Structure formats: C-alpha cells, structure tokens
Amino acid sequence: MAKIMIQGTASSVGKSLIVAALCRIFKQDGYSVCPFKSQNMSLNSYITLDGKEMGRAQVVQAYAAGLEPEAYMNPILLKPTSDKKCQIIVNGKVYGNSTAMGYHNLKLRFKDMLKEHFNKLEEDFDIVVMEGAGSPAEINLRDRDIVNMGMAELVDAPVLLVGDIDKGGVFASLAGTMLLLKDGEKERVKGTIINKFRGDVEILKPGLDMLEDIVHIPCLGVVPYTRLQLEDEDGAVEFNKKAYAPIDIAVIKMPHISNFTDLDALKSEEDVSIRFITSKEEFKEPDLLVIPGSKNTIEDLLYLRKCGLEESIKEYSKDGKIVGICGGYQVLGSKIKDPYKVETDLGEIDGLNLLDMETTFEKEKVTTRVSAKLIDEKIENTVYGYEIHMGISEYSENVKPLFKIYDKNGEKVDYFDGAINEKGNVMGTYIHGVFDGVSFREKIINELRVKKGLKKKKSQVYEHMREKELDKLADIVRQSLDMKKIYSIIGMK
C-alpha cells in the first residue's frame, strides 16, 4: 500500500482540500484510496451510518474518494466547549471531557489504536492520503505529537508541506517550518506546495528557485486561489455576498457556533445571499433568520442577551421567518434546564420564548442518523440528516411538531422532531443537514421568493453539485501539481 501525508505551515492553509483533491485524483486514476486524519479539532461534525461522530473535513474527503464516511477515517475528534476545555470523541463515541493540559497528558495512550486503524487501511486500500493538523513545527508539542510528524513516523509516511501565499509570507513560513523540524523529520518532507496563489506564476518562479536552494526540497506546484462550493470546517468564514441576489438570509454567528456546514446547501441557490450577524446593528431586515447549532447553548444564549440580539430576534419574529437548528432550536424555547451541569453551573435559564417548549440537558449524547417527513398534508417532503445533542425538548399543545422521524440508524421508528408555532413562521429542529435535501430547502426558499413577488424555482441536488465541485477541484490541482513526481514519491507508476 502507498501513503502520503499532507502537512501545513499553519491552520487554514488548505490541507483539507489538497487531501480531498488527491483522493479524487487517485480515484480517477483507478486506485482505491482512503483519507485519514488521526486527530481533528472542529465544531463541525457528522454522524456516520452506524451512529458514530467524525470531523466534516474527512467526510468531504471520503466523498472525494468515492467512499461512505466512516469514523476510522478520523479516530480522534476534539470539540472545544470553551477556550480551555474540549469534548474528546474516540472512534466516534464520547470518551470524556478534558482541559487542554489533560488531553496533552492523555493522548500518547491512543498511539496503538491509531496504528491499528492505519494497519487495517493498509490491507484495504491502494493509497491512504493522510492529513496533519496545524503545523508540524509546534516544537512545544513535539514529544507527544500524534497528528503531524509523530503520526508520519509511526507509519513511515512521506510528507508534502503546504503553505498559503494568500496570507503573505509563504516563503518565510515554509523555510521557517523546515528550520524547526528535526533532521529525521526534514528527511520525510519530499516537496512543498504553494496554495491559494493569485496572479502570474512567472513572477513567482524566481522565489521558488531560491526557496529550493534554502530548504533543499522541490516545490511540486502552485495551486491557484479558487472559490469552490465545498464545506469549510476550520472556521465560520464569511460568505461571499452575491451581487443582485434578492433573497437575504442572516445567520446568527454565536461564539460557540457549530455545524455551520448546515448552511452550505443554501449557498447553492443562485438567488440567495447569506451573511453572518454578530450585533443588532447588523440585523437589518433579512428574509430568513437562521440560528445555527452551538457547542455551548447556554453561553450563546447569554451572548444573545448581552449584545442585544435577543431583542432583535423577538421583534423580527412578529413577521419574519426563523429556523433554529439543534442549539439554535433549543434557544427558541421558554426554558433550558441543565440539572447535571453539562454546560454551565447555572442549572437553568430562560430561553427566547418563541416556542412553547422546554429543553433538559441529559448526561448521554444523542448521535444518530435519521430520515424524516415534514408534517404537512399538502407536501411529500422527506429530509435526511443526523442528530448530535445532549438535550431533550418537550413542547406544549400550542406547538406543533415539525417532522416525523421514520428511520433511525437504519431501524424503523415513529416519533416527532422539532416544533413550529401556530403562525408557521418560527420553527426548529434537531436535524443537522436539514437543508441538504432538495424538498425542504426548496419549500423554504420558494416561500421567501413568493413573499417577495418572485417566481418559484427548482433547487439543485446538493450531492450532484458537490460531485461537480470535487471534480473541478481535482482538475485544478492535477494541472497545478507535478503528479508524476507525487506518484514517484509514493512508489507508484
């Protein structure tokens, strides 16, 4: 089996998309390929068919490889709950909560498990494309590293180092990273990649030659800056406002926002523009307000209260349409109770009181794939998605359920999810990916179009669009990199 590891000079330099591109290229060339990231830190996660939790970047990479996402592609997932604490997910299930120092002291015990996972991949696939995290030059973390050079050494993988020229200082970051590596680590780095380049590459070439003289490894290519409609899990990046897009969707950007990838399918609508808001001054008059998921719902509710957005949301709810997802659904209720102090020591807190329901946080985390139908006799409306939450919500007779769940992790079930008020303009659900399917997204956006005097439209199938974008990504990267050299590095062709 062949293997290659993509590391970067920093976070957000484009490692995840380079891995996805290589997965798609190798697949196109007829090889069985699998992505692997030993440890990921992200608030954007996904639930596999067997109910396990993993990072979204490896989900996109799995699709690029033509595979169903599996938790073994990302055995360790860290989900920050505050600046100093995180929830640890191991093999798709909650392992526990820890401080940064606690996990630092803990992680070496996972090395054997990671090696076992990788050995299994060696048996099942022709090529494994690995991804590092942050930078391999974090010298204070070197002795307990299990995600960058520590993982590369564990499985004897060659490394390609990616730098982001769009940030500026790419030559310094590449040379500086190499300077801080140990001799054995330097020998693993077989080439550099410059990512996100804008302009004429001829102007860059003298710098590439000088860089090679300094670091003594070749530059394998320059990848142009490209806007793609693919998920970004590293942070809630600002959406690009579309010119002349008549439908304005505002999204509350809370401090602990999670699973904002729920919004990606909305970006596929040509006449829809999405913007984040963090203050009441930015609120304005959106056609739809989305309150997304949160890793700390109570803290984010306090944030809405403190910055004045609570007042703006309540005023908007009189005539505007609101969709809350997971934590965003919970804050719409009248009360949130936390008897086991899962999130804070407050015990309970009043919600926005836009839906007559109460949420209680439990000790056990719900992680499940679901299929549901919208409770609307006029429409055959099916939604596929997943749930990740620790709260159970109960509502009064004044509130109608939004969906009926009929499949849970492949088993037939029959229970309700979500809620919608009597007026029909405020609703919420626990289902992540609720907009990914055509029917519900099309229904919501067409209601907004009609309200503005616009014609209804058919929505794109998000999965088809994603496949086209992955092929586009692969084409760009194939044309930009020396693939013959990369095949030589991994010992193939």
From Swiss-Prot:
It comes from the Bacteria. The active site is at C326, H432. GO terms for biological process: cobalamin biosynthetic process. InterPro entries: Class_I_gatase-like (IPR029062), CobQ/CobB/MinD/ParA_Nub-bd_dom (IPR002586), CobQ_GATase1 (IPR033949), CobQ_N (IPR047045), CobQ_synth (IPR004459), GATase_3 (IPR011698), P-loop_NTPase (IPR027417). Gene3D superfamilies: 3.40.50.880, P-loop containing nucleotide triphosphate hydrolases. GO terms for molecular function: ABC-type vitamin B12 transporter activity; catalytic activity. The keyword Nucleotidyltransferase does not apply. Transmembrane segments: none annotated. Residues 246-440 form the GATase cobBQ-type domain. Coiled coil: none annotated. Keywords: Cobalamin biosynthesis, Glutamine amidotransferase. Pathway: Cofactor biosynthesis; adenosylcobalamin biosynthesis. Catalyzes amidations at positions B, D, E, and G on adenosylcobyrinic A,C-diamide. NH(2) groups are provided by glutamine, and one molecule of ATP is hydrogenolyzed for each amidation. PANTHER family: COBYRIC ACID SYNTHASE (PTHR21343:SF1), DETHIOBIOTIN SYNTHETASE (PTHR21343). NCBIfam families: cobQ, PRK00784.1. Belongs to the CobB/CobQ family. CobQ subfamily. This is Cobyric acid synthase. It comes from Clostridium botulinum (strain Langeland / NCTC 10281 / Type F). The gene is cobQ.
